Amino acid sequence: MKRSEKSSTSVVSNNKQQDVNIISSNEVGVKEENKGHQEFLLKVLILSVIYVLAFSTRLFSVLRYESVIHEFDPYFNYRSTIYLVQEGFYNFLNWFDERAWYPLGRIVGGTIYPGLMATASLVHWSLNSLNITVNIRNVCVLLSPWFASNTAMVTYKFAKEVKDTQTGLVAAAMIAIVPGYISRSVAGSFDNEGIAIFALIFTYYCWIKSVNTGSLMWAAICSLAYFYMASAWGGYVFIINLIPLHAFFLLLTGRYSHRLYIAYSTMFVIGTILSMQITFISFQPVQSSEHLAAIGIFGLLQLYAGLSWVKSHLTNEAFKKLQRLTVLFVLSCAAAVLVVGTLTGYISPFNGRFYSLLDPTYARDHIPIIASVSEHQPTTWASYFFDLHILVFLFPAGLYFCFQKLTDANIFLILYGVTSIYFSGVMVRLMLVLAPVACILAAVAVSATLTTYMKKLKAPSSPSDANNSKESGGVMVAVLTVLLILYAFHCTWVTSEAYSSPSIVLSAKQNDGSRVIFDDFREAYRWIGQNTADDARIMSWWDYGYQLSAMANRTVLVDNNTWNNSHIAQVGKAFASTEEDAYIQMKALDVDYVLVIFGGLTGYSSDDINKFLWMVRIGGSCDPNIKEQDYLTNGQYRIDKGASPTMLNSLMYKLSYYRFSEVHTDYQRPTGFDRVRNVEIGNKNFDLTYLEEAFTSVHWLVRVYKVKDFDNRA
């Protein structure tokens, strides 16, 4: 009886214990579920804040000035978007612009990447379809900030795929405000790069996803992302070379897999076919030297996969013999195709900009028109810190953590980082390509460091070194926190002061901190549009061609497309010649008005006098009589009394300094004192014979001259 009572008691106690265990396990499950919900909500909140931050931090220019298009190239994009919205896509692709490159004109549809215009017009159409009436200008102004927010989200997914969620959140926060990317994505910067960086990161994310999963769907999405990138920016060549490089390194390191084969073969075939639908690209993916690496890696993967299959059906000796013969045959065929294609002209050589990336001195020595563009200059060390701040130091740390654990994704990140750091050093414009990977690698370093030291703060290894661990962990976390706060302050300051000023509206700060606005450009363009004939031809340096076409709606001789070097050289030659010789050239080109930018009164350093030597160099590339040495004095570029006679009598000098001797720029200086060059001009007393002043803006920034008609007696 007692035994039965004991046994029943033990059964009851066991049941109670099981119930307690079930309850405790359920409680643990509920807690974990609640924790998962909390983490999800926190992640959504952080990403929402980042999304809003990425958009709002780019609105300084709109708040400070107004909704206005920035820089030079965006004005052509804006004008083209208006044409696309009004005329439709078919007419846009067949648009011949008779107001550009007089008397040649320009076939627009076949000479541009239409992705930006198509995106803006699609957004405009979508909003108006929803009865949200929005002006196309506002769509163009705000498109880049919106895509910057989308880029932050894609960067989160990319970094998460490479490492983990924490890294993704840090990377998204960093790229939301990094100056290197903001420089091309502020409100009003309606340029190709504004949407292209989103397409770039999205393509890379889809590529890593397809390599990790071997999914045909992700490879197809990667192809679509690549197609969008190809439609938006010429930087798509970076993608179609980096992805093959990644595949090649995976082969070299013995990481070949069916996942890689599926991802690359699908992406290359579909992506190439789609990119060839862009009129400007056409057959370049199968003809140009820039795409040969992608074709070669595609063939190499097919060969490797085929040999791997054959190997399972042959003996080792037979396979080695077949392998040698196959490799020899393929190399011979590839060399023959390369030689024949190059000799027959089927395979086109590298273009000038691509050569400049491989050889930084190439453009300077052979193509001055490329070297004259400021964004094509090599990057200084100061620019790296200015555009990246602490990312400069976290970048190598991120590479170190990637090397510690080599995966397919980490190898891609390493290759992306190393190649982009090289190209950004060659051309300052490509800082834009470096900024995203710098943020991701910095996020890898920050995330790994914080994870390590936060563990020390929470759980010391033993009581003996608990204090040391907590102290070192606390110091490291505090240092990183301070650095990230400084990064945020620096990014905000750079965005506000350096990258939120439209070139068409200038401003300066007075001693009391208030701003003075110089709206001379729009004033001049409005005057030209209202006071000149509709068919008037305007000659200016190519920098201002797009703005003249969009703002004044007048015909220009050259513009920022710079597709015809000899035509630009004719304009450069005219500005470098004497007034009499230039008059003959201008009449031959049917020029009605000449526009020059002059900053001597206001201190605007980006005026035509400072650009004049580039006009001389480019003009001299087509006329050997134009020599740079003739415009220098003992190797120095001067505009004072010590300037060379050739310089003092050039058309550019006379148009810039005409009547400047009547102006006092400073009470302590003589008349005709140039505030940019900080000298008194050398030639004051001269008149114009063949041109007459038509308009000078309030601050003398823009000067317009009318070309006189021929004297009948002549």
Curated annotation (Swiss-Prot):
Despite low primary sequence conservation between eukaryotic catalytic subunits and bacterial and archaeal single subunit OSTs (ssOST), structural comparison revealed several common motifs at spatially equivalent positions, like the DXD motif 1 on the external loop 1 and the DXD motif 2 on the external loop 2 involved in binding of the metal ion cofactor and the carboxamide group of the acceptor asparagine, the conserved Glu residue of the TIXE/SVSE motif on the external loop 5 involved in catalysis, as well as the WWDYG and the DK/MI motifs in the globular domain that define the binding pocket for the +2 Ser/Thr of the acceptor sequon. Keywords: Endoplasmic reticulum, Glycoprotein, Glycosyltransferase, Magnesium, Manganese, Membrane, Metal-binding, Transferase, Transmembrane, Transmembrane helix. Catalytic subunit of the oligosaccharyl transferase (OST) complex that catalyzes the initial transfer of a defined glycan (Glc(3)Man(9)GlcNAc(2) in eukaryotes) from the lipid carrier dolichol-pyrophosphate to an asparagine residue within an Asn-X-Ser/Thr consensus motif in nascent polypeptide chains, the first step in protein N-glycosylation. N-glycosylation occurs cotranslationally and the complex associates with the Sec61 complex at the channel-forming translocon complex that mediates protein translocation across the endoplasmic reticulum (ER). A motif (DK motif) lies at residues 608-615. Residues 1-39, 163-164, 214-215, 253-257, 312-326, 404-409, 453-466 are cytoplasmic. One of its GO terms (biological process) is protein N-linked glycosylation. This is Dolichyl-diphosphooligosaccharide--protein glycosyltransferase subunit STT3. Residues 541-543 are annotated as: Interacts with target acceptor peptide in protein substrate. It is found in: Endoplasmic reticulum membrane. A motif (SVSE motif) lies at residues 372-375. The lineage of its organism: Eukaryota, Amoebozoa, Evosea, Eumycetozoa, Dictyostelia. Its cofactor is Mg(2+); Mn(2+). A motif (DXD motif 2) lies at residues 191-193. It catalyses: a di-trans,poly-cis-dolichyl diphosphooligosaccharide + L-asparaginyl-[protein] = N(4)-(oligosaccharide-(1->4)-N-acetyl-beta-D-glucosaminyl-(1->4)-N-acetyl-beta-D-glucosaminyl)-L-asparaginyl-[protein] + a di-trans,poly-cis-dolichyl diphosphate + H(+). GO terms for molecular function: dolichyl-diphosphooligosaccharide-protein glycotransferase activity; metal ion binding. The record marks D73, E375, K611 as: Interacts with target acceptor peptide in protein substrate. The gene is stt3.
